[in-house]
Amino acid sequence: MLPIKPIQPYPALLLQKKSERVLVVADLHLGWEALLIQKGVHIPSQTPRILDKLLRLIKKCKPTRLLFLGDIKDAIAKVEMEEWRDIPNFFETINKKVPDIQIVLGNHDGTLEPLLPETVKILPTTGAVFGNFGLFHGHAWPAPELLGCRNLITSHIHPMVAFRDPMGFRMTRQVWIKATCDGKRLAKSVLKHSSGKVAANPSTLLRDQFNVEPKVSRLFIMPAFNEFLGGRPINERRRGKNAKSRAFIGPVLRSGSVNIDNAETYLLDGTFLGTVSQLRKFG
């Protein structure tokens, strides 16, 4: 069983601490249809469907806070017309249901702030802490303070598993990933990035500079809330030089501190599929 509480069968989780109930979702990529339109594929906006799913989830969970773990919008360097049209209304609607909304910025969110109500709080790409959980999007290094949490929660890669039948037909399914994490090795990488120093004893440096005792032992990767997106099949075999590091995006997954081969995979309904290494023969 997972020590976090995914809301089955949604790609969302609920974190609780006393009277606080934080609903966490990630990777909405609102306005993603604009990219298809530019390629000559015209489909209706899917934002109303995503909004309806989120409203049903809010009604079910009754959160006191809603935390978005990055990539609200889809266009990276600009704001598309569809985003100007859809995103303000999206947040005004959910803000009426949940007054406390926070967003950890993702790599697609550089021009997001002008589209948001003033009541929405923007958090840095380095993430945030809630109880014993450190949450960050995953395209950038987490803040050193997050290393004082036992569990890290990230998103960004839209994790999926791929299956091929005997005829060669391929299908994919969204999954949750639960992996063990070498906290000291991760701390060494984070400190090298944040301070430029290679620490012989990262635990001591964390305590001295950030008053943090490194505790990280697990990392969870959330599936994308937007079910229409593609994903990264984590069980596909890759060949060639540095194949393992190229299989993942984001500095933490490439740091060597996360044991992906033995990571557990779960479908959205909670079904345990096996470890990543066990599933590679099906990819």
Label each PLM-derived region with a short phrase.
Residues M1-G283:
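Extended recognition/assembly regions associated with phosphoester-bond processing machinery
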